[in-house]
């Protein structure tokens, strides 16, 4: 059976292996999923303002997959990964057959301008998740201790257990006899601090040549904060909502896989 090439980009601080359960469901549904394991950690693609180099990292990775497939591929991404996928498709026409934003609402209009002002005043670190990420605990005596720590944190409490165990297994590494977060906290914080304030301008200068869809979580605080006006415009109403928070792909991997298949098939996959 022919598999549909799909390049998936992860959310900030949750490397691709965290989505292993979701990827397995997608592969069962006929998608050949490929992903960069850890965005922001390759010195050839440093974190910079408006994520210029991260966008290029996704574009270069997707182009390699497109060359293997003999044509454009589908791009999907969760949060950070969704924005990078959208920007890569805009900057590189012909790369993507379509883009799927997974709880990655597009910031536009006055909100985008306000973000630019906040970044210019160097206040974004105190207003974004960066305020928490730079001081987050990142060391545990064992893998099981890390599992128990995250299991009882509100943001992780609804996660599918297999997904949480994948996060602990792959998202922490052995160092000096302890388990340490594999995703560097400074890089995570820097990604938040350099969040793009130019998305609407970028899309005006580089009109998308492919369809875009969005899947959101009904309880997503991120979606409510950003608003959906720009997203509705860019997707032309191709929107699916699932019960869950911003991290619904980790909470409901099977339902998320079904929604991803629906969204991509609807766009012609």
State where each predicted segment sits.
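Conserved loop-alpha-helix segment in the C-terminal half of the alpha/beta-hydrolase fold
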Residues: 203-244
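Conserved hydrolase catalytic core segment
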Residues: 71-114
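Flexible "cap/lid" loop of the alpha/beta hydrolase fold
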Residues: 98-139, 224
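Conserved HGGG/HGGXW glycine-rich cap/lid loop of the alpha/beta-hydrolase fold
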Residues: 2-45
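Catalytic histidine-centered segment of alpha/beta-hydrolase-like enzymes
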Residues: 244-257
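Glycine-rich His-Gly loop
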Residues: 8-11, 79, 217
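Active-site loop/oxyanion-hole signature of alpha/beta-hydrolase fold enzymes
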Residues: 34, 38-76, 106, 112-118, ...
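Alpha/beta-hydrolase
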Residues: 137-218
């Amino acid at each position: 059976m022919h598999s549909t090439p799909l390049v998936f980009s992860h959310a900030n601080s949750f490397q691709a292996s965290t989505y292993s359960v979701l990827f397995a469901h997608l592969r069962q549904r006929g998608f050949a999923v490929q992903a960069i394991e850890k965005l922001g950690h390759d010195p050839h693609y440093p974190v910079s303002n408006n994520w210029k180099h991260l966008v290029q990292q996704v574009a270069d990775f997707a182009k390699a997959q497109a060359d293997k497939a003999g044509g454009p591929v589908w791009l999907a991404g969760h949060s950070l990964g969704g924005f990078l996928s959208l920007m890569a498709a805009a900057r590189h026409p012909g790369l993507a057959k379509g883009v799927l934003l997974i709880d990655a609402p597009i910031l536009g209009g006055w909100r985008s301008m306000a973000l630019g002002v906040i970044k210019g005043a160097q206040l974004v670190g105190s207003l974004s998740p960066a305020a928490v990420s730079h001081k987050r605990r990142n060391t545990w005596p064992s893998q099981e201790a890390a599992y128990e720590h995250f299991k009882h944190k509100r943001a992780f409490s609804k996660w599918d257990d297999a997904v949480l165990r994948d996060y602990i297994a792959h998202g922490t590494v052995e160092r000096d006899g302890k388990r340490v977060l594999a995703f560097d906290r400074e890089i995570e914080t820097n990604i938040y601090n350099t969040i793009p304030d130019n998305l609407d301008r970028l899309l005006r200068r580089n009109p998308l040549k492919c369809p875009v869809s969005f899947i959101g979580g009904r309880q997503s605080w991120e979606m409510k904060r950003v608003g959906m006006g720009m997203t509705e415009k860019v997707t032309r109403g191709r929107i699916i909502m699932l019960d869950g928070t911003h991290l619904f792909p980790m909470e409901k991997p099977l339902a998320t896989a079904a929604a991803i298949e629906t969204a991509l098939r609807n766009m012609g996959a």
